[in-house]
Amino acid sequence: MLKPSIDSLLKEVPSKYSLVILASKRAHELDEGVQPTVESFDSVKSVGRALEEIEAGTVISDPNPEEKRERLRIEREERKRQREQEQKELENRLRDEKN
């Protein structure tokens, strides 16, 4: 028997299609290093871990994916600006130390 079972997973999402999409997206997030929402996993693979998180109810489908995409885009841009600012500050400090 597969764990988590499809029956327990379908209690958390509205359809098999939604389950596949959610598990796939969450597995990609886990592969990218996003913090897990469950402390320990039975599975070593990211898809299995994503399914375990879904079963635990700690990962849900976003009701407004476009808004989430925009929010993530803004967050990425902000992180990029912060890295650039830190790089400029470091370059300025190094330049000042040389003078």
From Swiss-Prot:
Its EC number is 2.7.7.6. Residues 65-99 have a biased composition (Basic and acidic residues). Promotes RNA polymerase assembly. Latches the N- and C-terminal regions of the beta' subunit thereby facilitating its interaction with the beta and alpha subunits. It catalyses: RNA(n) + a ribonucleoside 5'-triphosphate = RNA(n+1) + diphosphate. HAMAP family: RNApol_bact_RpoZ (MF_00366). SMART domains: RNA_pol_Rpb6 (SM01409). Gene3D superfamilies: 3.90.940.10. Belongs to the RNA polymerase subunit omega family. This is DNA-directed RNA polymerase subunit omega. It comes from Enterococcus faecalis (strain ATCC 700802 / V583). The RNAP catalytic core consists of 2 alpha, 1 beta, 1 beta' and 1 omega subunit. When a sigma factor is associated with the core the holoenzyme is formed, which can initiate transcription. GO terms for cellular component: DNA-directed RNA polymerase complex. The keyword Translocase does not apply. InterPro entries: DNA-dir_RNA_pol_omega, Pol_omega/Rpo6/RPB6, RPB6/omega-like_sf. One of its GO terms (biological process) is DNA-templated transcription. Transmembrane segments: none annotated. Keywords: DNA-directed RNA polymerase, Nucleotidyltransferase, Transcription, Transferase. Pfam families: RNA_pol_Rpb6. The keyword Chaperone does not apply. One of its GO terms (molecular function) is DNA-directed RNA polymerase activity. Residues 55-99 are annotated as: Disordered.
